[in-house]
A protein has these predicted regions:
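Alpha/beta catalytic barrel-like cores
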Residues: 1-156, 276, 312, 322, ...
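Acidic (Asp/Glu)-rich catalytic clusters
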Residues: 32, 118-129, 177-183, 243-244, ...
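Glycine-rich anion/phosphate-binding loops
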Residues: 103-120, 158-174, 298-306
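Surface-exposed amphipathic alpha-helices with a cationic face
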Residues: 119, 123, 172, 176, ...
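Active-site loop segments of alpha/beta catalytic cores
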Residues: 134, 153, 159-266
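Catalytic-face loop-and-helix region of soluble metabolic enzyme cores
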Residues: 248-361
Length: 363
């Protein structure tokens, strides 16, 4: 792994994107206020079903049917073969540098009010962001949750599998193109909650090599466009697999699952040696009571304990802090708006406290 640009986050905060609000301008203003250095475009799943992570990126894919808040591929419909051929033709055109073809994979305002809200807000800022962040649903999560007309996982269909992996890459490339226009470096994170079940009987027949190949194909496209590639998984998974993948950022649930990272010291060391950074999901969002009761002091103590645990395994403390992003443990879209705003406040406070304490605040 060779980073597309030098990146040491030094405890800067960022978010995973989702908020429970329904007004995109208000939600975007919140993210820009609390995470101005690495803002993400906001996802608003409570505004409409179309902002659900499984359907938000479906535009431009062949054979998609949406009915009764269910989305699936129908490969039996008349015209599907032509649509499939057209999809791959547009993909090849994008690979050849055709901007018009790339625009056929746009995320429209109906699926993401937060996207145009961020693009409108960014030019009004006095300082450009350190990095602009986009996000996509990862190929494993998308492929194992979307089905065909017979409710068979798309991941197990060779053609649909290929469509999904290339679809993720195309949605990432479209975001990179538009975010780069603001003059800031770009990172794209893949959201992979379904990796929690990788290796279980639920996903029998899916190999480690399959998952690595898909992640690396998307990451390769992101890197070729000059952006950083990251993955978020909010629960326990085989982190050694993700550490082996060609990824620059791994975002984990440091609040409830810190031990998941500490199980793989050799793989983590190799990840750091390649320039990788960790997103510490230390501000809780999955447990509303924890989100309501944790304090700056309690989260600081929990974060320091996590750093100490890795330092005890031979990692240099300063390296851990230089390569740390401070994030929520998961998206905040399931919380109430006041609680989500409390999470953002804690996130900002914790990052600012760490950066001041460690001497990062000036750089």
């Amino acid at each position: 792994m060779s980073l597309p640009f030098p990146f040491e986050p030094r405890c800067l905060p960022t978010t995973l994107g989702s908020l429970p609000h329904t007004d995109a301008a208000q939600a975007t203003a919140l993210l820009l206020a609390y995470t101005p250095e690495i803002p993400a475009w906001v996802q608003l799943p409570k505004r409409t079903w179309h902002e659900n992570m499984l359907v938000q990126y479906l535009e431009g894919l062949p054979g998609i049917v949406e009915e009764n808040e269910r989305a699936y591929f129908d490969t039996s419909r008349p015209g599907y073969d032509d649509a499939l051929t057209d999809f791959f033709a547009r993909y090849l055109a994008v690979e050849s540098g055709d901007d018009a073809a790339l625009e056929t994979f746009a995320i429209t305002p109906e699926r993401s009010r937060g996207w145009p809200a961020l693009l409108t807000a960014l030019p009004k800022r006095f300082h450009p962001p350190v990095v602009a962040k986009g996000q996509v649903t990862g190929p494993f999560t998308w492929g194992t949750n979307l089905t065909d007309q017979n409710r068979r996982c798309a991941y197990y269909d060779e053609q649909l599998h290929d469509v999904i992996v290339k679809g993720v890459a195309l949605k990432a490339l479209w975001q990179i193109k538009h975010l780069k226009a603001f003059g800031a470096p770009v990172m794209i994170w893949m959201d992979e909650p379904a990796l929690l079940g990788f290796g279980s009987s639920t996903f029998i027949g899916i190999s480690r090599e399959d998952v690595l190949r898909d992640l690396n194909e998307v990451a390769g496209a992101i890197h070729n466009a000059g952006a950083l590639a990251g993955v978020h998984c909010e629960a326990n998974t085989d982190w050694s697999l993700l550490m082996e993948a060609d990824l620059d950022i791994l975002d984990f649930d440091a609040y409830d699952h810190l031990e998941a990272i500490t199980l793989y010291p050799d793989e983590l060391r190799a990840f750091f040696d390649r320039g990788g950074s960790l997103g510490w999901g230390i501000v809780p969002t999955l447990n509303p009571q924890a989100a309501a009761t944790e304090t700056l002091e309690s989260l600081l103590a929990r974060f320091d304990a996590g750093v100490a645990s890795l330092a005890a395994r031979g990692f240099e403390r300063k390296l851990l802090l230089r390569r740390a992003l401070i994030t929520p443990s998961c998206g905040a879209g399931t919380l109430t708006p006041p609680l989500a705003e409390r999470v953002l406040g804690l996130l900002r406070e914790l990052a600012a406290t760490l950066r001041k304490r460690e001497g990062f605040a000036g750089g």
